[in-house]
Amino acid sequence: MIGKLSGKIDAQGDDYIIIDVNGVGYLVYASGKTLGKLSEGEFYKLFIETHVREEHIHLYGFLTIEEKNFFNLLQSVNGIGTRMALSILSNLTPTDIQIAINNEDKDIFKAISGVGAKLAERIVLELKGKVAKISTGAAIINDSLNIKNITSVASNEVIKALVNLGFSRFEAQNSVQGIVIQNPEISIDELIKTALKNRNAGL
């Protein structure tokens, strides 16, 4: 079983890379977020999950052990296979997933193509007691910023306002989280202005 590969990226496709390790090219599937951080000709270390089936052997690569752990965790949910797990990780980081599950936020998962209401509910229900066992740093974020419990900045109302201004719900929630972590006492007006300013600046 292959657990790690270190080598140069020879080629990259829509959902995979070919990594050259001592002259041998391995085809490795990866999430969109991981692929976006890789460049052809550069050297990387990838954590590998090997899936052996009767008809094939597939390798799945991750830049962090946390992403690999969540790839496996997501597949423990009924209805999620390797392709759907990668799709979710292409849209959400492990920390995003942990925060969403802790906050029972099904909408973040429903926004992902192929994830319906029932599957989103299963993700939250089936992983609620499991995500705490995987360290991502989300516990620190969640202690200081629980979307459902912050009344001082009325975060849910701000998220709705940002969605009305053209943000996706995921973009709005991430923006609110980042701003409030840095300034917990920020007013609603300033929060909205800062979110818009950050978006226009590409932050």
Swiss-Prot record:
Entry keyword annotation includes Metal-binding: no
Source organism, top-level taxon: Bacteria
Family: Belongs to the RuvA family.
Keyword Cell membrane: no
Keywords: Cytoplasm, DNA damage, DNA recombination, DNA repair, DNA-binding
Compartment(s): Cytoplasm
Pfam families per the UniProt record, alphabetical: HHH_5, RuvA_C, RuvA_N
Domain II: annotated segments: 64-142
Residue ranges that the Swiss-Prot or TrEMBL entry lists as coiled coil: none
Chain spans, region Domain III: 150-203
Taxonomic source organism: Rickettsia akari (strain Hartford)
Name of the protein in question: Holliday junction branch migration complex subunit RuvA
Assembly and binders: Homotetramer. Forms an RuvA(8)-RuvB(12)-Holliday junction (HJ) complex. HJ DNA is sandwiched between 2 RuvA tetramers; dsDNA enters through RuvA and exits via RuvB. An RuvB hexamer assembles on each DNA strand where it exits the tetramer. Each RuvB hexamer is contacted by two RuvA subunits (via domain III) on 2 adjacent RuvB subunits; this complex drives branch migration. In the full resolvosome a probable DNA-RuvA(4)-RuvB(12)-RuvC(2) complex forms which resolves the HJ.
GO cellular component entries: cytoplasm; Holliday junction helicase complex; Holliday junction resolvase complex
Role: The RuvA-RuvB-RuvC complex processes Holliday junction (HJ) DNA during genetic recombination and DNA repair, while the RuvA-RuvB complex plays an important role in the rescue of blocked DNA replication forks via replication fork reversal (RFR). RuvA specifically binds to HJ cruciform DNA, conferring on it an open structure. The RuvB hexamer acts as an ATP-dependent pump, pulling dsDNA into and through the RuvAB complex. HJ branch migration allows RuvC to scan DNA until it finds its consensus sequence, where it cleaves and resolves the cruciform DNA.
Alphabetized InterPro entries for the sequence: DNA_helicase_Holl-junc_RuvA_I, Hlx-hairpin-Hlx_DNA-bd_motif, NA-bd_OB-fold, RuvA, RuvA_2-like, RuvA_C, RuvA_C_sf
GO biological process: DNA recombination; DNA repair
Annotated region (Domain I), positions in chain: 1-63
Gene Ontology molecular function terms on file: ATP binding; four-way junction DNA binding; four-way junction helicase activity
Record-linked NCBIfam families: ruvA
Residue span of region Flexible linker: 143-149
Domain text: Has three domains with a flexible linker between the domains II and III and assumes an 'L' shape. Domain III is highly mobile and contacts RuvB.
Gene name linked to the record: ruvA
